[in-house]
Structure formats: structure tokens, C-alpha cells
Amino acid sequence: MQPPQSVEEVKATLETTEKGGVRQSIRNCLTVFQRAPVLAGAIAYNILTDRKDIIKPIGFHRESTALTDTDMKYLLLYLEETYGLTSEKKIETAIGIVANENKYHPIRDFLNSLAWDGTERIRFCLRHFLGADVDDYTYEALKLFMLGAITRAFKPGSKFEIMLCLVGGQGAGKSTFFRLLAVRDEWFSDDLRKLDDDNVYRKLQGHWIIEMSEMMATANAKSIEEIKSFLSRQKEVYKIPYETHPADRPRQCVFGGTSNALDFLPLDRSGNRRFIPVMVYPEQAEVHILEDEAASRAYISQMWAEAMEIYRSGRYKLSFSPAMQRYLKEHQRDFMPEDTKAGMIQAYLDKYTGETVCSKQLYKEALNHTFDEPKQWEIREINEIMNQCITGWNYFSNPRMFAEYGRQKGWEREIPATDTDNPPEKSMDGFVEVTEQMELPF
């Protein structure tokens, strides 16, 4: 970009017609936007919002950075009066070109400007503001969410399917936490109401952290599948009204959930790996997040600085470790309705003395359908319970004979592991004590 010149210097460089007037050309319009003292460097393309911005004062009062219709009217007036340029279409074309040559991303600029002071905060943040437990799970959950947000800012469209869900009573500050975590209020939104809206991109556009509160509060088995599918998307395909063709809009945002109800997750025995619930206890919080908003925002800025250190190191994955995944699956059951059928089957197996069971047997004897024949979906449900919820039983696929149920696939009781590395010790008289479980060698 060339340095700004005076109005007279700019006028002297403009192309003219044969009659000496200013030529109404895109080149002349570009010259003004690139060199004029008021306009040079003023127009930029905001990668986050996918819009053109005015990023420096240009002589009239403005409410926001985004280029508006009112701004265009002022610009048209200024170019006409100062430079004799009157072609609205060519002025708009020049604005598009100069904006494309001057791109910026406000979130990237913010994150790159941070310097971490070396104090660990991510591990203690949810305790500090919301009274959550200080443990590895809570730390890994928030760290993963923040790294996902950073990655989406620097690499739009990156695969990240995780939703951090804050669970606790009303007034705990859950929504406020997500709003302040987004740093600027305009980078936060809680206005996403429908996932099948053709204009959903407009709801995501320009935002970094989006809270899904109402949808989580009313989630059922069907809607939770829709939310899962929505979270899995990496882009939206959308045609902005003034454009001719639809285009891919890679996602630059992440999604947080809040719920006042403890059992907000519908029963899903296979697990809801996309949803990471964290229980909050506001009475245990060290401070209320709005008690000193400036201090809270400074604390959160240092959290982002800490997360940027991890991001720059490259020593992270945008997923839980296998051990944490196993913990998550168990932990999520605390946030689901009681699984009564799994409880009935477990109670039956606790008293059962046989070594094998089949699904028809469990249907009739554990679930008390003595005289009924199971439907196929009921068999699938029992299979899911046995494979996902019940421990101590292993599935076998080669059918075996059951006295009352014929040849069936099923499950066999796990054989307890024996300590072969530590043979029984001899007694004082030199004999080995034989337990009930040991076979005599004759």
C-alpha cells in the first residue's frame, strides 16, 4: 500500500477524459481509496464476520466498524464532492478490491497480542468462577474447548465436534462465563434457536463462542441426534444475498451448552461423546464472575494466553485421551435419566448362578415378560444394554443351546483372573494348601 497523499496530489494522478473531466473508472476509484489521506487503509475485509469494515475514523460519526448503507451514502457524497467520482457501481467495485487486499481477523490479532505471565489458570478457572471441582477431567474439558476455539479461529473449518456443557442451578453464571470467555460481547451469541434454518450461517457469522441453552434444556432423543449432526459440520454452504453463487463458509466458532437440569442428556447407552458435562456449584465459587468484571476479563485474557502457549507448542490433540474418554462415558450417566431396564437386568444377573444368558432369557426372566415374545427392537435394546452397560459378561457370536430358548447367541460370565505369577506358598510341613477352586492332580 502506498503512503497517503494530499487531496491535490491524488487528484493529479487521476485519469481524465478527452474533455478534461475525471474519468469514471474503477482505476480512479481504487487510486482514491489507496492514496487519499482520509481513505487510505480505512477499508478492510473482516475474515471473522465475512464483511467489509471501516477500521479508522473517516470524518463522520459511526456506531460500529461494519460498513453500512449509511456509510456508503457518506462515501459516495465525499468522492463526488472531493474527487468528482460519481459511479456508484465502480466505487463499490473498488471498495471490494481494496478490502480484499487489506484483510484482517480480529480474534487472531487478539490472540497473537497476548503474553502469558506463567501463572496456570485454566485448571482452576471453573472452580474460581463457578465452583466446579478442581480435577483432571474439568481441566482437560475446558482446555480442550479453548484449544478447539483457537484452532477454529486460525484454521476455519477444522474438525471439532465437542460441546462443553455447564450444568447447575439458575443464576450460577454459566451463560455469563461463556459470554466473557468470548472476550468481546460481539464475538458471543446465544441467538441460535433452530438448527434446520436455511439462514443458520447468519446466526454463526462473526461469532466465536455460541451458547446453546434452550436447545439443551428441551433436548430429547431426536433433537440430540440433530444437535450431534450439527456439531459434526465443519462448514455451512450459504449464498449471501448480493452474491450470485453459494459458497462454503468454514466454521470459525465453537458451541457451549448450559442446563439447569441435572438429567439434561437423553438416555444414550452408546454414549454422547460430543457432550462434555461439567457440574458447577456456585456456592463454592471463589468469586462471582460479575463481582469485578474487569478483573474477570483480565483473568480470562490470561487463560487465552496460557492456551496459546499450548497451541503454539503443538503438543495437544483436539480430543480426549482414551482413558478420559472412558471416564467421560461413565460420567455422562450422571446426567441421563435412570436406565430402569439396565437396572433390572443387572439385578437379575447379580442373583443368577448360570454361566451363560441370551437376550430372550433376559427379556422373559429379567424384564418379566413371561408370556410375551420379544420384538426385534426389544432384542436390540437388550443387546445394547448388555454390551454397553453391563460388566462381567462377554458376548459370544456362535450360537449355543439354551434349554428353554433353543440355539441362541448370548453372553458368558467372565472367568475371574488367576494370579499365576504367585503360586500358593507351602505350609510349615511342606504341603501346599488346596482351595476349593483348585483341582487335585489325581
Regions found by a protein language model. Give the residues of each.
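Feature primarily recognizes SF3-like P-loop helicase cores of small DNA viruses
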Residues: 80-105, 159, 186-190, 196-223, ...
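N-terminal nucleic-acid engagement/recognition segments and initiation subdomains in replication
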Residues: 1-121, 140, 372-373, 377, ...
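P-loop NTPase catalytic core of nucleic-acid-dependent motor ATPases
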Residues: 95-205
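Residue-level preference for alpha-helix termini and adjacent loops
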Residues: 38, 44-47, 53-54, 59, ...
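Amphipathic alpha-helical segments that form well-ordered structural scaffolds
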Residues: 125, 145-149, 176-180, 226, ...
